[in-house]
């Protein structure tokens, strides 16, 4: 049993270590500065109550992006120095964000221990590599992201930090081999356990879904399937789940080897960045080679996001969560007793609202950030939730879950097709169009303007807030842009009063609400590593069955024109077009 000592290292604060909705994200070149990561980790330990650190069990893993291995060694040595009792590390340092949440909630160590929290090393859908992004966030004992009370405290600590604790002579741990290594420090034993990254998560998925039913679908000669991990951590789970457990062909998996630079790509599952999958599903500019699969899906870097595609058909994330909620009780055993409630982020379309009303379910509209859903789930108020940024999940964990969403869709397809496996399969497009026929359609798009000058972005938002004091002026501008648009009846900055803990979250996005249910929403995103990202959300509700089959960009064109004119987007940003359209 190796001995280690503890050193106190003098340090000074770094500017800008304020965690956003998903932790601290910066360029790798920022994180590799001496003391930078250490300051943030010590500030996090100092923000936690003593019982969550001293004698505690912590998970440390991530999506495998560049600098993860070095960060795991640093955090492990700091945990030992701060009195943590054990560290759990996924093999090769890999754990998807949803798997971390599952491990915190479900896993019991060989000595009966349970994790009280986790450092997750990810920048989610942001690129990886020496010149790209790195990130770190802390998750609590419920498996969810640290609430604002903790993240604010972490930030305050980063502004005053004078020293951090580290065990410099603790040997680097071999994260490639499963097993336990024991050490002894000034406060007693310290153990590091490297464990199988996938087994706990797979066990949880098998308790939620009818794997046999999905297996029948995936092994049917009439059904074809394609899953793209975009070289993110989902690759560590894809073969084990889709091939070994569910019988899919191995060649149905693409880009499923995790890479520290995500193969040089952008691990963001959308129509812009998941190019290979989009082409294979018949949604690219040229005709695909070979037969187009019935079902396709993609994940982001840390596997908490998902994109669902049918044959030549894109399912919007807003529709996806509504369709899962509408079919969950019948198609997914975990929900057979009924849903406790549903929730969506404010910018997500109101498709879920209509389902909730139809099924008489509790409904909540929350700010962007999964922690708000977590509060509702912990209080037993929410079963299924989602956000327009390709995040979908349920109360099985406290993070969004990309593979869970794919299994939910496969469950719905299996349920709808169960008596027709030998004849005509129900397609993804069939399910979506039937949903629109029942509930109406929410035409929806999102324009992202990335790496905009931060000052210009703030000026644009201030302009939009000022306009809200005069709705007649707003309507005059909109009518000047397009006569085919309804009247704005309300404008505000979204504010959320949490029904569970009473906390108030202000300035969560600028909203313009129209008489016919249409919405324009403008937000500054906190997930980028530099510059500002302006997100513009455009939504129009259509109940007329004769009008629900239009192309989305055609149906929304008048509202898009109105939004660009109202915001003076080009004037403020110098951009004549968005970086990404979803």
From Swiss-Prot:
Pfam annotation, one family = PGM_PMM_III
GO MF entries: magnesium ion binding; phosphoglucomutase activity
What keywords sit in the KW lines? Carbohydrate metabolism, Cytoplasm, Glucose metabolism, Isomerase, Magnesium, Metal-binding, Phosphoprotein
Q: Per UniProt, where does alpha-D-glucose 1,6-bisphosphate bind? A: 25, 124, 304-305, 368, 387, 389, 400
Cellular component aspect of the GO annotation: cytosol
What this protein catalyses is:
alpha-D-glucose 1-phosphate = alpha-D-glucose 6-phosphate; O-phospho-L-seryl-[protein] + alpha-D-glucose 1-phosphate = alpha-D-glucose 1,6-bisphosphate + L-seryl-[protein]; alpha-D-glucose 1,6-bisphosphate + L-seryl-[protein] = O-phospho-L-seryl-[protein] + alpha-D-glucose 6-phosphate
Q: Which InterPro entries match?
A: A-D-PHexomutase_a/b/a-I, A-D-PHexomutase_a/b/a-I/II/III, A-D-PHexomutase_a/b/a-II, A-D-PHexomutase_a/b/a-III, A-D-PHexomutase_C_sf, A-D-PHexomutase_CS, Alpha-D-phosphohexomutase_SF, PGM
Q: What is its main location?
A: cytoplasm
Residues making up the signal peptide according to the UniProt record: none
Q: Give the active-site positions.
A: 124 (phosphoserine intermediate)
**Where does it live in the cell?**
Cytoplasm
Per its Swiss-Prot or TrEMBL entry, what cofactor is needed? Mg(2+)
Query: Which top-level group of life is the source organism from?
Result: Eukaryota
Q: Does the keyword Ribosomal protein apply?
A: no
Question: Which amino acids does the record list as binding Mg(2+)?
Answer: 124, 300, 302, 304
| Note describing how the cofactor binds | Binds 1 Mg(2+) ion per subunit.
Q: Which family does it belong to?
A: Belongs to the phosphohexose mutase family.
Cited function: Catalyzes the reversible isomerization of alpha-D-glucose 1-phosphate to alpha-D-glucose 6-phosphate. The mechanism proceeds via the intermediate compound alpha-D-glucose 1,6-bisphosphate. This enzyme participates in both the breakdown and synthesis of glucose.
What PANTHER family does this protein map onto? PHOSPHOGLUCOMUTASE, PHOSPHOHEXOMUTASE FAMILY MEMBER
Under which name does UniProt file this protein?
Phosphoglucomutase, cytoplasmic
Q: Which organism is it from?
A: Pisum sativum
